[in-house]
Amino acid sequence: MFGLGGAAPQISSQQKLQAAEAELDMVTGMFNQLVEQCHSKCINKTYNDSEVSKQEALCLDRCVAKYFETNVQVGEHMQKMGQSGQFMGRQ
């Protein structure tokens, strides 16, 4: 009532823009890291064929799946740590 009490402060447009930019940077960085790691692991350094082989495609598929699964698991673990009040280096 009347702006007093438990109302959360409004986030400004500038803060929303900064948060969106930070999220975009994070997603772009994660994508670039994924491409670099899976490409170096799965694609032969000397291209013998103009198309991705079945073996390379399977490796890439597994690499991407593992990468995302790992990120989900890490995110869930960090969320649990945050909810329980644990922080890095402290248990």
From Swiss-Prot:
Gene Ontology annotations for the cellular component aspect, listed alphabetically: mitochondrial intermembrane space protein transporter complex; TIM22 mitochondrial import inner membrane insertion complex
Entry's free-text remark on domains: The twin CX3C motif contains 4 conserved Cys residues that form 2 disulfide bonds in the mitochondrial intermembrane space. However, during the transit of TIM10 from cytoplasm into mitochondrion, the Cys residues probably coordinate zinc, thereby preventing folding and allowing its transfer across mitochondrial outer membrane.
- Name the job this protein performs: Mitochondrial intermembrane chaperone that participates in the import and insertion of multi-pass transmembrane proteins into the mitochondrial inner membrane. Also required for the transfer of beta-barrel precursors from the TOM complex to the sorting and assembly machinery (SAM complex) of the outer membrane. Acts as a chaperone-like protein that protects the hydrophobic precursors from aggregation and guide them through the mitochondrial intermembrane space.
Q: What is this protein called?
A: Mitochondrial import inner membrane translocase subunit TIM10
Q: What are the record keywords, sorted?
A: Chaperone, Disulfide bond, Membrane, Metal-binding, Mitochondrion, Mitochondrion inner membrane, Protein transport, Translocation, Transport, Zinc
Q: Where does it primarily localize?
A: mitochondrion
Alphabetized InterPro entries for the sequence: Tim10-like (IPR004217), Tim10-like_dom_sf (IPR035427)
Protein species of origin: Debaryomyces hansenii (strain ATCC 36239 / CBS 767 / BCRC 21394 / JCM 1990 / NBRC 0083 / IGC 2968)
Q: How does it sit in the membrane?
A: Peripheral membrane protein
- SUBUNIT field: Heterohexamer; composed of 3 copies of TIM9 and 3 copies of TIM10, named soluble 70 kDa complex. Associates directly with the TIM22 complex, whose core is composed of TIM22 and TIM54. Interacts with the transmembrane regions of multi-pass transmembrane proteins in transit.
